[in-house]
Amino acid sequence: MKRDLSLAGTAEEILRRSSDIIFSMIKDIAMKEPSPVEQTGEVTVFKRRRPEDGNLAPLKTTAEAYDYIRMLQAEGYPRAFVETDELRFEFEDAEVADDGVIAKVKIRNKFTKL
């Protein structure tokens, strides 16, 4: 049983859409009791993300930065960031613009409070 899922928007938006699909599938499974079908194809294994995986510094394109920012915007996920020696810049609400990406940024001092 497969359903299409749009990957547009933030991680939070994608998770909401996927939950709607999952609940619909649960209802179908309970009512129709389909026969299991063995999966085919190559197995893909993903490593668990760590907070430091959200660092934008190694990225090369604005498209990569946009995807990082939007995919790390969900409850429980640390935001995409860039750091200097003293400051941490955390990004959210990314939008593609004509000449790059526009996003909200929260700037934190890494070692002291305001």
Residue ranges and their predicted role:
Residues 1-112:
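Active-site-proximal loop/hinge segments within enzyme catalytic domains
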